[in-house]
């Protein structure tokens, strides 16, 4: 019975480690999705303001460039040359 208890404890520890790893990956991907949504909203605002008046979107462009410079790469930046 003692070996069965040890195996059960080991299985619980392994299951807990796997759960932590999986939820960490889910959290990281969720943050990526939120950042991408923020970038998409900024792009939409820039496009809308360009249609109205080209000079009003400078603040949004600065915010977008700050996001991209922080490592949040936008999908339209392709450096495969």
UniProtKB/Swiss-Prot annotation:
The chain crosses the membrane at residues 8-28. Keywords: AIDS, Apoptosis, Host membrane, Host-virus interaction, Inhibition of host innate immune response by virus, Inhibition of host tetherin by virus, Ion channel, Ion transport, Membrane, Phosphoprotein, Transmembrane, Transmembrane helix, Transport, Viral immunoevasion. The keyword Phosphoprotein applies. Residues 29-81 are cytoplasmic. One of its GO terms (cellular component) is host cell membrane. Residues 1-7 are extracellular. It is a single-pass type I membrane protein. The modification Phosphoserine is found at residue 57. InterPro entries: Vpu, Vpu_cyt_dom_sf. Residues 53-63 have a biased composition (Acidic residues). Ion channel activity is inhibited by hexamethylene amiloride in vitro. It holds the Pfam family Vpu. The keyword Transmembrane applies. Its main location: host cell. GO terms for biological process: receptor catabolic process; symbiont-mediated suppression of host innate immune response; symbiont-mediated suppression of host type I interferon-mediated signaling pathway; symbiont-mediated-mediated suppression of host tetherin activity; viral release from host cell. It is found in: Host membrane. Gene3D superfamilies: HIV-1 VPU cytoplasmic domain (1.10.195.10). Phosphorylated by host CK2. This phosphorylation is necessary for interaction with human BTRC and degradation of CD4. Residues 50-81 are annotated as: Disordered. GO terms for molecular function: CD4 receptor binding; monoatomic cation channel activity. It comes from the Viruses. HIV-1 lineages are divided in three main groups, M (for Major), O (for Outlier), and N (for New, or Non-M, Non-O). The vast majority of strains found worldwide belong to the group M. Group O seems to be endemic to and largely confined to Cameroon and neighboring countries in West Central Africa, where these viruses represent a small minority of HIV-1 strains. The group N is represented by a limited number of isolates from Cameroonian persons. The group M is further subdivided in 9 clades or subtypes (A to D, F to H, J and K). Belongs to the HIV-1 VPU protein family. Enhances virion budding by targeting host CD4 and Tetherin/BST2 to proteasome degradation. Degradation of CD4 prevents any unwanted premature interactions between viral Env and its host receptor CD4 in the endoplasmic reticulum. Degradation of antiretroviral protein Tetherin/BST2 is important for virion budding, as BST2 tethers new viral particles to the host cell membrane. Mechanistically, Vpu bridges either CD4 or BST2 to BTRC, a substrate recognition subunit of the Skp1/Cullin/F-box protein E3 ubiquitin ligase, induces their ubiquitination and subsequent proteasomal degradation. This is Protein Vpu. It comes from Human immunodeficiency virus type 1 group M subtype B (isolate CDC-451).
